[in-house]
């Protein structure tokens, strides 16, 4: 492995630049992860709300169906 790849103390500017770049990349990845986490949570909350609404409408439909009396013939 060459000295520049190992990042030895002969070139501290190179080591500092790599450290700075690595820190920046980690910050970017962390920020992206937080954004994705927020988006996922928002989508999950939206789906939960929609499922609650669907359950309620199904419950109402079942109640209406059970409250309608069957039509009987008088023949």
From Swiss-Prot:
Source superkingdom: Eukaryota
GO cellular component: cytosol; nucleus
InterPro entries: HS1-bd
Name of the protein: Uncharacterized protein C16E9.15
Organism: Schizosaccharomyces pombe (strain 972 / ATCC 24843)
A biological process term (GO) from this entry: cellular heat acclimation
GO MF term list: transcription corepressor activity
Family per similarity comment: Belongs to the HSBP1 family.
Pfam families noted in UniProt: HSBP1
């Amino acid at each position: 492995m060459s000295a520049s790849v190992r990042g030895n103390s002969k070139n501290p500017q190179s080591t500092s630049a790599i450290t700075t770049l690595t820190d920046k990349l980690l910050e970017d990845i962390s920020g992206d992860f937080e954004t994705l986490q927020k988006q996922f949570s928002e989508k999950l909350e939206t789906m939960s709300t929609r499922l609650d609404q669907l359950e309620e409408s199904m419950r109402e439909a079942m109640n209406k169906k059970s409250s309608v009396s069957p039509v009987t013939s008088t023949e």
